[in-house]
């Protein structure tokens, strides 16, 4: 065995463990208009200085590694490195900090959410010096926004396609979510659409199981759509889930939906992946299909307050990847969602320009450069008594989705749909007349019950149903 010998290094290179602060902590840095900015909630391990920790985050999510390498001399680190340019303690929290990191735009492939996330949240979340790390927000620079196509159509084009204006849209997830045959599934869709809903929906885990293969479902649902349209004179849709085990299978299902002439399909964007989602969004844009996006698996990523990725980031990146609808929580239903936080990322989904507002969790001003907006979908444990709050919270540009709140009606699916449609139109009219739905919403619903027995029956069934749990993720 040859004994190891000490090697003397040249004057321009010295190996060893890096002190990240020397290179990546730059509090004097002036942010460029083209930089991608990130706000991380950071919890260092005991004894690790926060400046070293946030510099490590900037390094490991950009050009850095744990030691000096001789190839650093073959490029310009000053041009390509991420920089921690600000650090602030989190009020009321021990050993927690918000670290602000700026990334040069040239670090990222144009039009690729996949590459953006691979860099910014790829390895750094497993860094040993960190006890916990959460990506709270991203500022996507206008120069980078313009490399994305975004939603296939957007809110205004969707309204034009559907010829529906002046109110929110109504939907319903077909239940039970698994186990129905394709024919019975189509029957449930027809009854809901005939009763007055605009949309029905595949549940996120309905793909192509032995009890209901995807092609059979598509055919029976298309029949239900056309039959209900003929009877009501309204344009109807069903979110046909195109999510599949392969990208080829996904596009095959999208093509089948196009050939059947249905207006909208669906994708589970987190389980399906951003690359698949962007490809599907491009297909929908080219072939005139609306794209409904479900966020299945999001709570695995975003629910913990100290670690993961906040949903406002997932919502922003979905707008970039492409989708016309996105589930956003309800504030009042069974799923997690604080009011101000939810309204913050709803604005980031819909509006063209959103100012920084820390009271709503928005860390950066975001300019979308006229990229089409995404319609928020309120779904999960809502019923007719929630309608005044939903109209007051979300306004008109939202899809309000009642699954059990439609199919659980004691008289059946169609009366359940009637009850929701009557409640929505009553609340919309009351709001337009200047009434305060936050205070008078209950009276609006009770008044509408006098001329809608379907609504009266629904109100009686769900009069005591509440989901009163404290929100985990608070500002």
Swiss-Prot record:
It comes from the Eukaryota. Residues 1-2 form a propeptide. The record marks 334 as: Transition state stabilizer. Mg(2+) binds at residues 201, 203-204. One of its GO terms (biological process) is photorespiration. The modification N6-carboxylysine is found at residue 201. InterPro entries: RuBisCO (IPR033966), RuBisCo_large_chain_AS (IPR020878), RuBisCO_lsu_C (IPR000685), RuBisCO_lsu_C_sf (IPR036376), RuBisCO_lsu_fd_N (IPR017443), RuBisCO_lsu_N_sf (IPR036422), RuBisCO_lsuI (IPR020888). SUPFAM superfamilies: RuBisCo, C-terminal domain, RuBisCO, large subunit, small (N-terminal) domain. GO terms for cellular component: chloroplast. Substrate binds at residues 123, 173, 177, 295, 327, 379. HAMAP family: RuBisCO_L_type1. RuBisCO catalyzes two reactions: the carboxylation of D-ribulose 1,5-bisphosphate, the primary event in carbon dioxide fixation, as well as the oxidative fragmentation of the pentose substrate in the photorespiration process. Both reactions occur simultaneously and in competition at the same active site. Heterohexadecamer of 8 large chains and 8 small chains. This is Ribulose bisphosphate carboxylase large chain. It comes from Dunaliella tertiolecta (Green alga). The lineage of its organism: Eukaryota, Viridiplantae, Chlorophyta, core chlorophytes, Chlorophyceae. The gene is rbcL.
């Amino acid at each position: 065995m040859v004994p190891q010998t000490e090697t003397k290094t040249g004057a321009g290179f010295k190996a060893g463990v890096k002190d990240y602060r020397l290179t990546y902590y730059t509090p004097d840095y002036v942010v460029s208009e083209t930089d991608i900015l990130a706000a991380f909630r950071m919890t260092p391990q005991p004894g690790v200085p926060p400046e070293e920790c946030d510099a490590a985050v900037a390094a490991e999510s950009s050009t850095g590694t744990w030691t000096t390498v001789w190839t650093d001399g073959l490029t310009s680190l000053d041009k390509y490195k991420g920089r921690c340019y600000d650090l602030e303690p989190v009020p009321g929290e021990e050993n927690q900090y918000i670290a602000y990191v700026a990334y040069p735009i040239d670090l990222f492939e144009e039009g690729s959410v996949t590459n953006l996330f691979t860099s910014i949240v790829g390895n750094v979340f497993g860094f040993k010096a960190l006890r916990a790390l959460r990506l709270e927000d991203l500022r996507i620079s206008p120069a980078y926004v313009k490399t994305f196509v975004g939603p296939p159509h957007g809110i205004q084009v969707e309204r034009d396609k559907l010829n529906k204006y002046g109110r929110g849209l109504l939907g319903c997830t077909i239940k039970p979510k698994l186990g129905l045959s394709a024919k019975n599934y189509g029957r449930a869709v027809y009854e809901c659409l005939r009763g007055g809903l605009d949309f029905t929906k595949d549940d996120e885990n309905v793909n192509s199981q032995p009890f209901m293969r995807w092609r059979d479902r598509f055919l029976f649902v298309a029949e239900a759509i056309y039959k209900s349209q003929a009877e009501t004179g309204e344009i109807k849709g069903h979110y046909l889930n195109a999510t599949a085990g392969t990208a080829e299978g996904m596009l095959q299902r999208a093509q089948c939906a196009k050939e059947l002439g249905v207006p909208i399909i669906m994708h589970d964007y987190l389980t399906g992946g951003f690359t698949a989602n962007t490809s599907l969004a491009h297909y929908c844009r080219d072939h005139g299909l609306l794209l409904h996006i479900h966020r299945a698996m999001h709570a695995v990523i975003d629910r913990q307050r100290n670690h993961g990725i906040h949903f406002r980031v997932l919502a922003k990146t979905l707008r970039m990847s492409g989708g016309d609808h996105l589930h956003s929580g309800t504030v009042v239903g069974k799923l997690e969602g604080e009011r101000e936080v939810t309204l913050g990322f709803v604005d980031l989904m819909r509006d063209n320009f959103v100012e920084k507002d820390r009271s709503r969790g928005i860390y950066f001003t975001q300019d979308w450069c006229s990229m089409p907006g995404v319609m928020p979908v309120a779904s999960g444990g809502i019923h007719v008594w929630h309608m005044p709050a939903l109209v007051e919270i979300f306004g008109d540009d939202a899809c309000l989705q009642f699954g059990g709140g439609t199919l659980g009606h004691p008289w059946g699916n169609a009366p359940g749909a009637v009850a929701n449609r009557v409640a929505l139109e009553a609340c919309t009219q009351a709001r337009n007349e200047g009434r305060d739905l936050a205070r008078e919403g209950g009276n609006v619903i009770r008044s509408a019950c006098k001329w809608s027995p379907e609504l009266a029956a629904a109100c009686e069934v769900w009069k005591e149903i509440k989901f009163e749990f404290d929100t985990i993720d608070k500002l």
